[in-house]
Structure formats: C-alpha cells, structure tokens
Amino acid sequence: MNPTELDSDVFAQDVDNQKARELREMLNTQDFVFAPGMYHALDARLAEMTGHDAAYMSGYSTVLGQFGFPDLEMVTMTEMVENAKRMVEATNLPVIADCDTGYGGIHNVRRAVREYEKAGVAAVHIEDQTTPKRCGHIAGKQIVSREKAKARFEAAVDAKQSEDTVVIARTDAYGSSNGDWDEHVERGRIYADAGVDIVWPEMPNPSREDAVAYAEEIHETHPDLKLAFNYSSSFAWSEEEDPLTFQELGDLGYKYIFITLFGLHSGAHAVYEDFKKLAEQDEEGQFDLEQRYLDHPTESHHELSFVSRYQDIETEFDPEARRRIEESEGFSEEQADPITSNDDD
C-alpha cells in the first residue's frame, strides 16, 4: 500500500469527554463556575472534598510547585500534560488546564490540545503571547500579531477530538509591551469569532472599572459570550476599597472564575509556618500540628489515598492478602485510627 492511501490523521482519537460536558452544563446553568488553582493530585482531591465545582491546574503553580521555576515557559508540554493526567485521575471534578501558548506553532498547538484531551482534561486555556511566554503579571510580555493569534485559536478549536472540550482564549494585550485596552477588547472579539468557548481578558491590576468596562464593551457585539476572570494571586484584593465579588463577576458574564495560585499560597504559607515551628521547637512542632489535624477530614493520609480500597482489590486477587493484613500491624478497616502505644492488642 502506498503511504498516500493511509489515513493521515492517525494521531486523532475519538474522545468521549464526559467531564467537559459536566463543565459545560455548569457554565450554562450556574451564575459562575469557580475553580481554585493548584498543581498536584492531592489538591485536586481536596478541592472535591471541600465542594468546589472544578479543579484548575495553574501553570505558575505547576512550574513553581513541581520544578521550583518561575512562569517563563521553562516546562514542556509533555511535563504539563503528565501533571494534568495525575490530577484528572485523583478527582471526579472537571480539570481545567493551562496550555500556555500551545508550545510552538500550529502543529504544536493542535498536538497539545489533543494530548490534554487524552489525559482527560475538560478544558484548556491558550494565550496570545509570544513564545516563550511569561506569567501575565511579570513585566516584559509581548503578544503575537492578530493574524497569528487567530490562527492559533482556530487550530486549537479544529484540533478538538471531542466537541465537548472547552477551549478558553486568553489575551494579554492590556499590559503587554505592544498592546493596549482597545486591542484587548478587539482581540476578544476576534477570538470569539475564531470559535473559542470562553474569552479570558488578563488584567494588569484588580480594577473594578476595567472588569466592568471589558464585559460591557465586548457584550455590545457578542452578547452571549462567556468570559473568564483571573482573581489573580498577584493582586492584593483585601487591600482594595471595594473588591469585586465572585457574584458580581458572574452577573457581568465572567462565568469561569479562578484564583491561579490559591493552593500554592495556602500550602506554602502553612508549610513554612509549621517548618519554622519545627525548626525552633523540635517535637513540639509535631505536637502542635497534630492538635490541628487530628479529627480533621485530612487527619489520615491513609484515607486520603484510599488505602482501604486498594487493600480490598488486593484481597480480591491475592488469596493470601487477607491473612497478611489480619496478622500484621498497621492501617486496615479494623485499625483506622491514628496509632498510639496505648492501643489494645
């Protein structure tokens, strides 16, 4: 057979993106969908335990939390997809993932969308910065031309293997070295016409006026367009006289709201304080931590990791597993409480 007779789109697969359908349903029926930013599987599970709508794999959180790097596109597409896959497998929530600029040209963008879909991600966001990109709140960012950006988003939409997968287009025009407010708004219109599901206008500060103005201006021409809002961890929201509320943003049409580095800041602050106490007070640091996590939903790392389920699977297939569990010490369904030396034998 001649190679020209083969199906040339062998890298495309039929993907049934159930989580994307769930996300779309929430976007269409709720005032807004909120997802805290995070970077690892346990955070995704904790988001589900605490009642969130979705889990957001933040790019900055991933590169800092997993690699210790700044958000300067120093991590590859495959590394990002692998992290997203781990999060997808750890939760029943829809996972929304940072796809940066698509990691190169048109072919890279298309591959990135498909790899994220195969990993089980419900939505991806792609931005219009030049490559390598940087966090939207690190000085020095530039945007590609309108033509290149439009092609990038059209390629992303066309590459979808499931019609349900949500594509979010981010524009960094406002605050970039070669953009301005008018470009910010016009690019949102261009990207909407390119077929994306949601437009995310990255803002350089927590201005209420800018958020309101953007929604009003773009909805003059695209009244049904859904917007995304980054309630950014780079901003001091608590110091604003009248900070935007999630409900206000939802009413303006910002249907997807997220805090990019919430999980990282929450974790880093807690770990720093506890490590510091441990360094200064030795075992008292452990005692203090125990007083806070005992009888808390996060008390047992065994329960957080579903050890009982894995033990059940083990006993189903290994005839000796039940005997070993019953005759040895350690966590089991019969011994699930934290271990002390006073436990009865």
Curated annotation (Swiss-Prot):
<comment type="function">
    <text>Involved in the metabolic adaptation in response to environmental changes. Catalyzes the reversible formation of succinate and glyoxylate from isocitrate, a key step of the glyoxylate cycle, which operates as an anaplerotic route for replenishing the tricarboxylic acid cycle during growth on fatty acid substrates.</text>
</comment>
<keyword id="KW-0329">Glyoxylate bypass</keyword>
<feature type="active site" description="Proton acceptor">
    <location>
        <position position="135"/>
    </location>
</feature>
<dbReference type="InterPro" id="IPR039556">
    <property type="entry name" value="ICL/PEPM"/>
</dbReference>
<protein>
    <recommendedName>
        <fullName>Isocitrate lyase</fullName>
        <ecNumber>4.1.3.1</ecNumber>
    </recommendedName>
</protein>
<keyword id="KW-0460">Magnesium</keyword>
<feature type="binding site">
    <location>
        <position position="170"/>
    </location>
    <ligand>
        <name>substrate</name>
    </ligand>
</feature>
<comment type="similarity">
    <text>Belongs to the isocitrate lyase/PEP mutase superfamily.</text>
</comment>
<dbReference type="InterPro" id="IPR040442">
    <property type="entry name" value="Pyrv_kinase-like_dom_sf"/>
</dbReference>
<feature type="binding site">
    <location>
        <position position="260"/>
    </location>
    <ligand>
        <name>substrate</name>
    </ligand>
</feature>
<comment type="pathway">
    <text>Carbohydrate metabolism; glyoxylate cycle; (S)-malate from isocitrate: step 1/2.</text>
</comment>
<comment type="subunit">
    <text>Homotetramer or homotrimer.</text>
</comment>
<dbReference type="GO" id="GO:0004451">
    <property type="term" value="F:isocitrate lyase activity"/>
</dbReference>
<dbReference type="Pfam" id="PF13714">
    <property type="entry name" value="PEP_mutase"/>
</dbReference>
<feature type="binding site">
    <location>
        <begin position="136"/>
        <end position="137"/>
    </location>
    <ligand>
        <name>substrate</name>
    </ligand>
</feature>
<feature type="compositionally biased region" description="Acidic residues">
    <location>
        <begin position="328"/>
        <end position="345"/>
    </location>
</feature>
<dbReference type="InterPro" id="IPR015813">
    <property type="entry name" value="Pyrv/PenolPyrv_kinase-like_dom"/>
</dbReference>
<keyword id="KW-0479">Metal-binding</keyword>
<feature type="binding site">
    <location>
        <begin position="58"/>
        <end position="60"/>
    </location>
    <ligand>
        <name>substrate</name>
    </ligand>
</feature>
<dbReference type="GO" id="GO:0046872">
    <property type="term" value="F:metal ion binding"/>
</dbReference>
<feature type="binding site">
    <location>
        <position position="98"/>
    </location>
    <ligand>
        <name>Mg(2+)</name>
    </ligand>
</feature>
<keyword id="KW-0456">Lyase</keyword>
<feature type="binding site">
    <location>
        <begin position="230"/>
        <end position="234"/>
    </location>
    <ligand>
        <name>substrate</name>
    </ligand>
</feature>
<feature type="region of interest" description="Disordered">
    <location>
        <begin position="318"/>
        <end position="345"/>
    </location>
</feature>
<dbReference type="GO" id="GO:0006097">
    <property type="term" value="P:glyoxylate cycle"/>
</dbReference>
<dbReference type="InterPro" id="IPR006254">
    <property type="entry name" value="Isocitrate_lyase"/>
</dbReference>
